[in-house]
Amino acid sequence: RGEISFEDCIAHQFRLIKASEYAILGEYDRFVSQRNGFGALVDFTVTRGIPLTIVSGGLAFIIKEFLDRNGWADLISLHVGKLELKEGRMAVIFPPLLERGSSCFKDDLVLRLKRQGKTVIYIGDGTYDFKAARASDLAFAVRGSKLARLCRRERVPFTEFQDFAEVVESIARSLG
């Protein structure tokens, strides 16, 4: 059908990067920012004993740097691709798909957690977050994002948000 998987798309993009991790981290402050209220989400999940996992196709070492700088590295787990430098270019190896019917590592994790009987809250913004959001128990989409448009079009229940404090309030109401 002329389609490529999420993992293949990201892997191709990473192969185009010729800079080292060191060079990329040197530009960290110019390009990395956090959405308002993320610290409140971390505090809320820690206080309530809710595991928090970042599931991302982004550069793992940048996510780790973000967590380290904010003192969250030990509080948040990662489900991301592993980066390797091959012939001066970045290569990414994503977690293997283990669940029947999964389309990418994002919904694969949600399906696995659901099979284990866990309640899954999913927060996303992109096209490749859709199947994971649809499979979750409670879905959140960044206001105006591709994920919000897809959920609306496909009538998948979700809550739109701009600030993570809104997510915290909604989860707190859901949990009672």
Task: Name each region found by the language model.
Residues 140-142, 158-163:
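Short acidic-hydrophobic, aromatic-tinged amphipathic segments that line or gate anion-handling sites
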Residues 85-92, 149-157, 168-173:
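Short, charged, surface-exposed secondary-structure boundary motifs
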Residues 56, 118-154:
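Acidic, Mg2+-coordinating phosphoryl-transfer loop and its flanking beta/alpha structural elements
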Residues 101-128:
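Conserved Lys-Pro-Asp/Glu-containing loop-to-beta segment of HAD-superfamily phosphomonoesterases
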Residues 1-75, 79-82:
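Alpha-helical substrate-recognition element adjacent to the catalytic core
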Residues 72-100:
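Histidine/lysine/aspartate-rich catalytic loop segments that bind and position anionic ligands
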